[in-house]
Regions:
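Signature for phosphate-centric chemistry
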Residues: 3-166
Length: 166
């Protein structure tokens, strides 16, 4: 790919893999536009068939995005615990109105498919991003990933299932 982080990662990998060899990392000359090798959709090299992609994803999701999130409620509840979401202004307000409050209710997830992109929005997207951040905190040796609220492998596995699901 053409972004600096990817190029620098390639250079570091090559230097670590073969420190005594002068391995050149190759990228396309124009780093201001997407590389078709890594981004064939964004560069228009190919396009998605919206109906087929949607059907395939929903089939894999269990029929709908609601089913997809429904099957992962245990993991979402664990994420809510780490985030202290029940104490958020939104949930406290809903509690006063005798309404339930969850990430999946507050941020409904939606599948978006176009000729050049597929994305999941809402709680699914947020959960994937946040759990990856927690994983990076752990990998970087931070003493208390997730504000110190992730303490055992079961919690890690549960949370990372949200990242892996997307």
């Amino acid at each position: 790919d053409v972004d600096e982080r990817t190029r620098k990662t390639g250079e570091a990998f090559a230097a670590g893999l073969a420190p005594d060899c002068a391995i050149t990392v190759h990228t396309q000359a124009d780093t201001s536009s997407p590389d078709p090798l890594f981004n064939p959709l964004k560069t228009g090299v190919c396009q998605l068939d919206n109906a087929n992609v949607t059907d395939a994803i929903l089939s894999r999701a269990g029929g709908s995005i609601a089913d997809f999130t429904g099957h992962r409620q245990t993991a979402f509840r664990e994420l809510e615990r780490v985030l202290n979401f029940p104490q958020s202004n939104l949930c406290l307000k809903r509690e006063k109105q005798d309404e339930s409050c969850s990430l999946t209710q507050a941020l409904p997830s939606e599948l978006k498919v176009s000729a050049d992109n597929v994305s999941l929005t809402g709680a699914v997207s947020l959960a994937s991003m946040l759990t990856e951040i927690f994983l990076l905190q752990q990998a970087q040796g931070m003493p208390e990933p997730g504000w110190g609220r992730i303490t055992d492998s079961h919690q890690w596995n549960t949370l990372l299932s949200l990242h892996n699901a997307q």
